């Protein structure tokens, strides 16, 4: 018995679109390229109409009774569909969770750097996980870490809103911030 191959080297089976001769339904509801109904006609007559106009007969909906076909230029239609899909992919931004780590005994300049990082992440539309980690007996000062995280949330309140308040998780205290959808309106002091 020959050994079984480790990988399937065959190319994947591509689903071919139902156009022209690949349409197997005997009766079709046909719509022309302008959107005008041509009525329910048999398949051969619909193919003849499409070839006279030098266009393709494309199956639009096979769930309908009878199935709906459209007379159109399939190459142009396929190009436009790919273009729309590409635009949609370009516009959709995958939200990531970026992390900003620090200790509760952080220096002023280091804190400002973390605020700058968090601001950059929030402006690019990502969520921010603020983590304060403890070493050894520092865990006894979790109240100082919570104060630090709340101060950070307060400093970033123009760009963000608290998604999850500070809470302890093992040897860390974490807080999640998400980008603010609407700009914060500051109240006038006076």
Curated annotation (Swiss-Prot):
Subcellular compartments: Cytoplasm
Keyword match S-adenosyl-L-methionine: no
Listed GO MF terms: ribosome binding; translation initiation factor activity
Keywords, ordered alphabetically: Cytoplasm, Initiation factor, Protein biosynthesis
Record has Ribonucleoprotein as a keyword: no
Coiled coil regions in record: none
InterPro entries the UniProt entry points to: T_IF-3_C_sf, T_IF-3_N_sf, Translation_initiation_fac3_CS, Translation_initiation_fac_3, Translation_initiation_fac_3_C, Translation_initiation_fac_3_N
GO BP terms: ribosome disassembly
GO cellular component term, pick one: cytosol
TM annotation in the entry: none
Role description: IF-3 binds to the 30S ribosomal subunit and shifts the equilibrium between 70S ribosomes and their 50S and 30S subunits in favor of the free subunits, thus enhancing the availability of 30S subunits on which protein synthesis initiation begins.
Entry similarity comment: Belongs to the IF-3 family.
Known partners and oligomeric status: Monomer.
Name this protein carries in UniProt: Translation initiation factor IF-3
